[in-house]
């Protein structure tokens, strides 16, 4: 009987585009799906993500490390999120080459590293976003009682725990993958057998989905809902000294990234794990999962481009740094020209920004709060 094989990201089975249409070996077991479109789609999206993600996250890390003081607990979570994005982006050139050429010449080790980087980024991003959401929940709902919990030391410990968790999951999944050679063409992260799916990968996938997606999703929705409900009380805003509109922007951007990038991908992956482990045997669902997987995979990788919006709307000092640097660049552009009016110096600009921050409904506290 035909061993029907399918492709899904890091849990991809045999390459249907590199061999004649698999899945139609018998009349009784036919489920033909042509998903060869995914190679050009993945290659194009990865190229965009590589360029935009490399620029935005590199600039963000530069600002975090050299242009602003990392005083808040949330800044620690966001820095780790940027590092996770940047590490993944650095592996994308290999994936771009593979998808456009449909051949992996880089060896088994880089294949495993590439897969581990993907899992680490996807689930690390969700967990770091969850940390930010929980931190915001504590800061707004329990602004005084949470002071002993919300420390930079505790934030660093939590980040270390997240890295250990996602690296363990990513490495565990990558151990079962290897490069395969078919007709002088080498594939990467394709060729998992039914036995591997039933014995290992289905269990690893379900564990990763529960710990890395379902629990974070529940926490994000719950924390955001409670925060929104708390903000309806006028006394809350006077206690935390911040602006309601700013908090609403933070929550909106945060949840938009989570829902657009991660919910579709993990929903399809969960279905695919059930299909491959034969917990569900339905050709329509197999076709649906195989067609939708590359599309949702591309949405998931776009988180590297969207995360900088979270940095901007979450950290007040991040906005301030860009404001100051923009003025510095404007000064340098007109330095050789005779000015009609005296341009403000950098200290004056910093003082102006500081005054604006102080006067906007206690936004200075926003930095220490979020």
Swiss-Prot record:
Glycosylation sites: 15, 24, 28, 183
Record-linked PROSITE patterns: G_PROTEIN_RECEP_F1_1, G_PROTEIN_RECEP_F1_2
Subcellular location: Cell membrane
Annotated GO MF terms: lysophosphatidic acid binding; lysophosphatidic acid receptor activity
Protein name: Lysophosphatidic acid receptor 4
Membrane topology: Multi-pass membrane protein
GO CC, alphabetical: intracellular membrane-bounded organelle; nuclear body; plasma membrane
UniProt function note: Receptor for lysophosphatidic acid (LPA), a mediator of diverse cellular activities. Transduces a signal by increasing the intracellular calcium ions and by stimulating adenylyl cyclase activity. The rank order of potency for agonists of this receptor is 1-oleoyl- > 1-stearoyl- > 1-palmitoyl- > 1-myristoyl- > 1-alkyl- > 1-alkenyl-LPA.
Protein family: Belongs to the G-protein coupled receptor 1 family.
Chain segments annotated as transmembrane: 44-64, 74-94, 113-133, 156-176, 204-224, 255-275, 295-315
Leader peptide range in chain numbering: none
Tree of life domain: Eukaryota
Organism annotation: Homo sapiens
Keywords attached to this entry: Cell membrane, Disulfide bond, G-protein coupled receptor, Glycoprotein, Lipid-binding, Membrane, Receptor, Transducer, Transmembrane, Transmembrane helix
Lineage of origin: Eukaryota, Metazoa, Chordata, Craniata, Vertebrata
SMART domains on file: 7TM_GPCR_Srsx
Tissues in which the protein is found: High expression in ovary. Not detected in the brain regions thalamus, putamen, caudate, frontal cortex, pons, hypothalamus and hippocampus.
GO biological process: one example: G protein-coupled receptor signaling pathway
Extracellular topology ranges: 1-43, 95-112, 177-203, 276-294
Pfam families for the chain: 7tm_1
S-S pairs: 111-188
Ranges of the Cytoplasmic topological domain: 65-73, 134-155, 225-254, 316-370
